[in-house]
Amino acid sequence: MGDQALSFLKDFLAGGIAAAVSKTAVAPIERVKLLLQVQHASKQISAEKQYKGIIDCVVRIPKEQGFLSFWRGNLANVIRYFPTQALNFAFKDKYKQIFLGGVDRHKQFWRYFAGNLASGGAAGATSLCFVYPLDFARTRLAADVGKGSSQREFNGLGDCLTKIFKSDGLKGLYQGFSVSVQGIIIYRAAYFGVYDTAKGMLPDPKNVHIIVSWMIAQSVTAVAGLVSYPFDTVRRRMMMQSGRKGADIMYTGTLDCWRKIAKDEGANAFFKGAWSNVLRGMGGAFVLVLYDEIKKYV
């Protein structure tokens, strides 16, 4: 096996392991965030039963759906996240070779920074093309608030993908894809670009203390998450449209979704669940740091 192929596989393995561990750890926060984002577009949650905020959601979920329901959709998330994060990291390094070949980070800072932004954004958009149906299914499973199997909209990952495909075809599994690409480019560009640039400007980038790495990563994930959050809210709302017919369809398209959320719910609605997203971002920061640590041993 060539050195390049071995390096690619190491990136894939290290990124995937780090992602699976961290996403399982923050799964309850992830579900709370998703419910707050999409409850307004859910057929299962009437206006009077909507969650009032993070604490209300955390208290009611175990009472109404059982404690283990905090991890509803987590299996789909791990399955989805393994290739997503692994491909992101692996492609990121390939794109860095394209955008940053021959660039001196000390003498050409802005070109180095722009190259990191481009490689991070391109990596995120590329991997999204492959795994979007899994991301869609994870969202719909997490948004399913039925207690028993008889009250659930879907009985699992396979059931979700099958039902939506039969109802809407492949298009249904890619609902909200365009706004997802916009959001993922913004998020990944900051996530990878700023992180790599900050680490690259340190005296010894390959031997950075784990606490310093974590602090840099934490700042990056928090900022990137908040900047791209409105795009995430719109794409989740669009995902909730699949499988609906006639009067049940809330939004005719992405632009209509942006417009209706702003008009009917106000600008704050774009940031519902954003605080839980910041907490969840700790998991994202942990992924970056864990990835660097795993690569030292793989």
From Swiss-Prot:
In residue terms, where are the Solcar repeats? 6-98, 111-201, 212-297
**Where, per the database record, does this protein carry Phosphoserine?**
7, 149-150
Cite the record's tissue specificity text: Highly expressed in heart, skeletal muscle and brain.
Name the UniProt record assigns to this protein: ADP/ATP translocase 1
Per the Swiss-Prot or TrEMBL record, what residue ranges does the short sequence motif Nucleotide carrier signature motif cover? Answer: 235-240
Keyword Thylakoid on entry: no
Provide the activity regulation entry from the record. Answer: The matrix-open state (m-state) is inhibited by the membrane-permeable bongkrekic acid (BKA). The cytoplasmic-open state (c-state) is inhibited by the membrane-impermeable toxic inhibitor carboxyatractyloside (CATR). Proton transporter activity is inhibited by ADP:ATP antiporter activity.
Q: Which InterPro entries match?
A: ADT_euk_type, Mit_carrier, Mitochondrial_sb/sol_carrier, Mt_carrier_dom_sf
Give the organism, scientific name.
Mus musculus
Q: What is the lineage of its organism?
A: Eukaryota, Metazoa, Chordata, Craniata, Vertebrata
Residues the record lists as N6-succinyllysine modifications: 147, 245, 272
> Transmembrane residues, as ranges?
8-37, 75-99, 110-130, 179-199, 211-231, 274-291
Q: Which GO terms describe its molecular function?
A: ATP:ADP antiporter activity; oxidative phosphorylation uncoupler activity; proton transmembrane transporter activity
Protein residues bound to ADP: 80, 92, 235
